[in-house]
Amino acid sequence: LHLSLRRQRQMCIRDRLEVDLIPQGTLAERCRAGGAGIPAFYTPAGYGTEISEGKEVRIYKGKPHILETALTADFSFVKAWKGDTAGNLIYKGTARNFNPLMAMAGKITVAEVEELVEAGKLDPNQIHTPGIFVQRIVQGVNYEKRIEQLTVRKKTHDVK
């Protein structure tokens, strides 16, 4: 959630939307812990900020750490570049950051893939999410490559 979006800000102000501020690394670790069955962990990230308010604090090696609980989901929806009919998934680029963690953290994971192949056709060394974590797989259609065009000034005439 990006809080600079006007609609989300208004929902927060009117108490219609609850927001938890979580450092990105902590969010990733909470998802990973949930998928691995680890109920909670300690981290120094966020100590001394509003993020740590109301959380258990312990000192490790002289440094304060706050207790963070694992995150799980009833359903996880992930998007992969390629997958096979057994649910094995390969991601491209930054999709590798959170998708594998969310696939593990969901009780039921639904994966959308750009390309679907038969089981056994993927190189096992390239698989990022094993099929054991995927319960449903669908092949998407009509993908659009969105590329932003950098504009530094208005075009006044054609350059030859």
Role assignments for model-derived ranges:
Residues L1-I13:
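Single conserved hydrophobic/aromatic residue that forms the stacking wall/gate
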Residues R7, T26-E29, V117-A119:
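Short gly/pro/ser/thr-enriched loop/turn and capping motifs at secondary-structure boundaries
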Residues Q8, R30-A33, F75, K79, ...:
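Alpha-helical scaffold segments in soluble metabolic enzymes
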Residues D15-G93:
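ATP/pyrophosphate-binding catalytic subdomain of soluble kinases
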Residues L71, L89-Y91, R96, M104-K107, ...:
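Conserved catalytic block of serine-dependent lipid acyl chemistry
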Residues G83, L101-K160:
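ATP/nucleoside-binding phosphotransfer catalytic cores, i.e., glycine-rich phosphate-binding loops
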